[in-house]
């Protein structure tokens, strides 16, 4: 599902009676896309968005809480892999001194930052660093070139990406593991237990929660049937211990 489609889902959640989060920037991206000649999703795609609304909102809330908790535990370096059009750098209450790196395709980051700049918005995080990169080649080198400190414990997030990683998820996590010292954290939306099992063997302490249990926690249920968000989806929260 496209980044714009997910932005539509976040925009809808922000206007719910009891929203799990408020994302005023989702509408900014929608308006910017329309002004650039983009088309809104088809009726079929809109039905799919509605079909996974509770799942998508619960996922966003879980990752939001993950970053807030990481900051509360003293981590000051954050990385979002394939950030898409979520505006966490603008909408979350970051601890002073935090640096947030966002890795994504150049076109996505260019559109995102231009749209927010045109709207007069500034990041809420102390230091925001977009890192244009192809996730299939050389992204970790570009991250270091952008100022990433390999000696500093880091909070990583991998959300909505694994179905699209052509060379397999373990190569992605190999690279994350290589540049993450003890004390680093990693949040992953995964399919099955393979990612959690691999991280456990590499010295990460892992907890998991299934999608249905997560939606129940947030008072959402019943729509987790779309093929993009299957019943075997789990949310992995890992801390590197060695």
UniProtKB/Swiss-Prot annotation:
Q: Where is the signal peptide?
A: none
Q: Which residues cross the membrane?
A: none
Q: Looking at the record's lineage, which domain of life comes first?
A: Bacteria
Gene Ontology biological-process entries: methylation
Tell whether Transferase is among the UniProt keywords: yes
Per UniProt, S-adenosyl-L-methionine binds at 104, 134-135
> Which InterPro entries does the entry mention?
Ppm1/Ppm2/Tcmp, SAM-dependent_MTases_sf, SAM_mthyl_Trfase_ML2640-like
EC id = 2.1.1.-
UniProt cross-references to Pfam families, sorted A to Z: LCM
MF GO annotations? methyltransferase activity
Assigned keywords, A-Z:
Methyltransferase, S-adenosyl-L-methionine, Transferase
For this protein, the record's NCBIfam families field holds: mthyl_TIGR00027
UniProt record similarity statement: Belongs to the UPF0677 family.
Summarizing the function annotation, the protein's role is: Exhibits S-adenosyl-L-methionine-dependent methyltransferase activity.
What is this protein's record name?
Putative S-adenosyl-L-methionine-dependent methyltransferase Mmcs_0580
Q: What is the native source organism of this protein?
A: Mycobacterium sp. (strain MCS)
